[in-house]
Amino acid sequence: MQTQILERMESDVRTYSRSFPVVFTKARNARLTDEEGREYIDFLAGAGTLNYGHNNPHLKQALLDYIDSDGIVHGLDFWTAAKRDYLETLEEVILKPRGLDYKVHLPGPTGTNAVEAAIRLARVAKGRHNIVSFTNGFHGVTMGALATTGNRKFREATGGVPTQAASFMPFDGYLGSSTDTLDYFEKLLGDKSGGLDVPAAVIVETVQGEGGINVAGLEWLKRLESICRANDILLIIDDIQAGCGRTGKFFSFEHAGITPDIVTNSKSLSGYGLPFAHVLMRPELDKWKPGQYNGTFRGFNLAFATAAAAMRKYWSDDTFERDVQRKARIVEERFGKIAAWLSENGIEASERGRGLMRGIDVGSGDIADKITHQAFENGLIIETSGQDGEVVKCLCPLTIPDEDLVEGLDILETSTKQAFS
């Protein structure tokens, strides 16, 4: 295995190649193959970017057909047939069946582009600067998004430039299960001497992926929406990792029955791992002047083609949604079993998550690392999350075959016992 050029030339900022130090050559659905021919089951899926699996054949064919037709690849924000098809599909397959009416902003290819656009739009629309985000939240590493990201590791990497115009509130459960953290937020909003500038918007993940699979309760989300409405504050749902079916619904906020003012999507939005993001906004919030927020890659037509194909294939009825929820119950049960075994053997652990966005909190980054390293040796790719990397985190493809899902869970259970027997 030749890695010298990779180790010598790629920046030290790299991470995943340190955890999984092999050279991969190909992938299909939930399996990756390295250059020595060894297969691995993938419980990482591009950190939630490959909800429909690696090289999904249906989406691959849509991509090949589009390329073969000499379709527009790069067109800035020109009107193209691919864009029209994408917007029509988004409206007819996703938005209208859910009673949602949004305009679409295409800000650039990444999730952090979408977050930057969302928070800037909120400031323009409301004429206020402050944005409220939550403890353990992750929204990106460009300066505006970073200001709303809680993890100190990312916030320290600014060269001394301060992050500004954001205030942090405790996420659901941050102060224990008996405390409703929104009491504190609501108290500050009502106190003119509380020190909190009335925000333009609140940005929140319904399930915090990088923060440790912290799940916002449905009633908590409903109350958050009510507080925002009562105080003329926009509600932004960052659905970049939790969206596109990851929690069992296309939008993760559907479980709570709320209607955000602004939604950010990326990661699995293209369906094929192509860089793609959009911002959904209530029509009356579209305060942009032409060209006021732009980017060279703000309309990736290859991603339009695969995203539309994914929506038609998987979201035209509830068959796929029900299958994701069925698989989620399998993972939940097995994670609960693994957590129980750890607790019985002196390592306090608990299962958490929603849909196929699940984790096992083992209380220590060192313990979680031992489990994931052993799992990799046994042929499973799975990562950790949380402020100290203490949560073993599963983001397997939603399309994973049952036999691969069960085999991956078997590997994880065996690896856990091997690491601590």
From Swiss-Prot:
Keywords: Aminotransferase, Pyridoxal phosphate, Transferase. Pathway: Amine and polyamine biosynthesis; ectoine biosynthesis; L-ectoine from L-aspartate 4-semialdehyde: step 1/3. It comes from the Bacteria. The keyword Transferase applies. Its cofactor is pyridoxal 5'-phosphate. The modification N6-(pyridoxal phosphate)lysine is found at residue 267. InterPro entries: Aminotrans_3, Aminotrans_3_PPA_site, Dat, Ectoine_EctB, PyrdxlP-dep_Trfase, PyrdxlP-dep_Trfase_major, PyrdxlP-dep_Trfase_small. It holds the Pfam family Aminotran_3. Optimum temperature is 25 degrees Celsius. Optimum pH is 8.6-8.7. The keyword Transferase applies. GO terms for molecular function: diaminobutyrate-2-oxoglutarate transaminase activity; diaminobutyrate-pyruvate transaminase activity; pyridoxal phosphate binding. Its EC number is 2.6.1.76. GO terms for biological process: ectoine biosynthetic process. Homohexamer. Belongs to the class-III pyridoxal-phosphate-dependent aminotransferase family. Seems to use L-glutamate specifically as the amino group donor to ASA, as it is not active with L-alanine, L-glutamine, L-aspartate and L-lysine, and is only poorly active with L-homoserine. In the reverse reaction, gamma-aminobutyric acid (GABA) and L-ornithine can also be used as amino group donors to 2-oxoglutarate, but with a reduced activity compared to that with DABA. This is Diaminobutyrate--2-oxoglutarate transaminase.
